[in-house]
Regions:
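Protein kinase glycine-rich loop
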Residues: 18-25, 29
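Conserved N-lobe loop of protein kinases adjacent to the ATP-binding glycine-rich P-loop
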Residues: 33-42
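Conserved short submotifs of the Hanks-type protein kinase catalytic core
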Residues: 90-104, 108
Length: 173
């Protein structure tokens, strides 16, 4: 199991770790301050490559990460988080994205169920439309980008009502 970054740790002289905000099979996600752009919060996705991989496969995995990061950094759509940087430290790769405030759809569904309420049809249709727009945009890229992990926990709803499709860990380009 990889060692978690410590709160206050600074990566690349630019990103100060605040706390861990997510964890999955591919790695961890941290909330960080961008020290170069005062007041900007970002999400750092950390991917640690399997140490047991032969050197040639480890190199291929890193090259694939860098290719995908380059493609994701070129994306510009209101329903996708903006990728602003990527870098490697040791066997760990990092993808820097805009931090998306708000709750994920799974959390909203659980909260509504606990209260015995339903999500509003108008809101759900708006969210579905925004997700569709993001997917159409991704699929129209050259080469097409396939998210491959659409689920409520990967759909963030910002306080302003904007939907962001997050977690490109299983993306296929």
């Amino acid at each position: 199991m990889p060692v978690a970054l410590k709160n206050g740790e600074i990566l690349r002289g630019r990103y100060r770790i605040n706390r861990i905000i997510g964890q999955g099979g591919m790695g961890s996600i941290y909330l960080a301050d961008d020290l170069r752009l005062e007041g900007r919060l970002c999400a750092l996705k950390e991917v640690e490559h399997d140490r047991s991989l032969p050197a040639d496969l480890a190199k291929q995995a890193r090259e694939q990460f860098l290719r995908e990061a380059t493609v994701l950094a070129r994306l510009d759509h209101p329903n996708l988080p903006k990728v602003s940087d990527f870098f490697s430290i040791g066997i760990r790769d990092y993808l820097v994205m805009d931090f998306v405030p708000g709750k994920d759809l799974r959390t909203l569904m659980v909260e509504a169920r606990r209260k015995g309420e339903y999500l509003s049809e108008r809101e759900v249709l708006s969210w579905a439309s925004q997700i569709s727009d993001a997917l159409i945009y991704l699929h129209s890229q050259t080469p097409p980008i396939l998210h491959r992990d659409i689920k409520p926990s990967n759909i963030k709803l910002t306080p302003s009502g904007l939907v962001k499709l997050v977690d490109f860990g299983l993306v296929k380009i």
